[in-house]
Regions:
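C-terminal non-catalytic regions of proteins with extracellular/luminal or membrane-system context
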Residues: 1-318
Length: 318
């Protein structure tokens, strides 16, 4: 496996024999043969202690309730330079499982259009793939016979490039699987079970083009003597700032599907360049990678209407 791994906050009773499965443990228990050279690299102190969550790169400090410097946020994906020739050779003729993660938490938001402390992590679009993530995926494509991308995140990340990449064999959403969810992920990857879920979010080509993004920020009450306009956000004074969600209900699919309908019907100036991610006339096909409710299966389904019986009284039976 390449990439990061996160799970939701769970509570287990170890004394009662309960276990928490990370992705490595789950894959091993389900009979997968893993690349030990790659595992040793990721677990080494140089890598594990510097990058990823243990390296201090998680949600804090993103853009939330009490952080003075949101620009310090980093994905923490390790650079291409950590992969030695021997490690890369060990990945030849294998199936690469690339894990993409973004943390999430209440009271915190990702802040678009900010400058990162690390040039390899681009945060004009924090839900887009960073340069290091892109480089890691290219390495996987170069050395492995098949590449599967696992989205270990609740956030709908920007993956339009992966969707259109013929070198990517599959993209699987895992969310935050908790204590045992990776066992189910392993069953999906092996084909033991047939995936049939559908995503509950819209995966946008560029999340920053959505109207809700315009309202992101920290706005302090300037007439508040305790805080003032230059105050640092802390746990004690977090009630001194506000956010106006003027987009109303039009977040996620409610925005994209409503504007799509208006675009088709030629109303509401829906096809203007306003809110377009590419500067051209707004076009649903260019704004949405995966729509709300999207999902694939290992099999195919067919729905057929056999007959329709319309009664004189106005009722119909199909």
């Amino acid at each position: 496996t390449l990439g990061g791994m996160i799970g939701s906050s769970v509570s287990i009773d170890a004394e009662a024999g309960q276990k928490q499965y990370d992705i490595q443990t789950a894959l091993t228990e389900k009979g997968f043969s893993l690349n030990q050279d790659m595992l040793d690299l990721y677990s080494s102190e140089d890598v594990n202690g510097t990058y990823g969550r243990k390296g201090g790169h998680s949600l804090q400090p993103s853009f939330g309730t009490m952080y003075e410097n949101p620009a310090a946020y980093k994905v923490g994906e390790a650079p291409e330079s950590i992969y030695t020739d021997d490690v890369l050779k060990s990945a030849d003729d294998t199936v690469a499982l690339v894990v993409i993660s973004r943390d999430s938490s209440e009271a915190s938001d990702y802040n678009p259009n900010m400058t990162s402390a690390d040039e390899a992590d681009s945060y004009e679009r924090p839900l887009a793939l960073s340069d290091n993530e892109k480089a890691m995926i290219e390495l996987a494509k170069e050395h492995s016979t098949k590449v599967v991308v696992l989205l270990n995140t609740n956030n709908p990340v920007e993956i339009d490039d992966l969707k259109n990449d013929e070198g990517i064999g599959a993209i699987v959403w895992a969310g935050e699987p908790g204590a045992n969810g990776f066992l189910g992920v392993a069953d999906v990857l092996s084909g033991e079970v047939n995936p049939s879920g559908h995503i509950a979010d819209t995966y946008a080509v560029n999340s920053t083009s959505a109207p809700a993004m315009v309202n992101y920020g920290v706005y302090l009450y300037t007439n508040n003597s305790q805080a003032g306009s230059d105050a640092v956000l802390t746990e004690e004074n977090k009630a001194d700032w506000y956010l106006v969600e003027s987009e109303g209900i039009y977040t996620g699919y409610k925005y994209y599907e409503t504007r799509y309908e208006d675009e088709i019907l030629g109303q509401g100036n829906a096809d203007t360049t306003e809110g377009s991610s590419d500067g051209a006339a707004w076009d649903y096909a260019n704004e949405v990678s995966y729509p709300f409710g999207y999902g694939l299966s290992y099999t195919t389904f067919e729905q057929k209407l056999e007959s329709v019986d319309v009664q004189v009284g106005g009722t119909a039976t199909a």
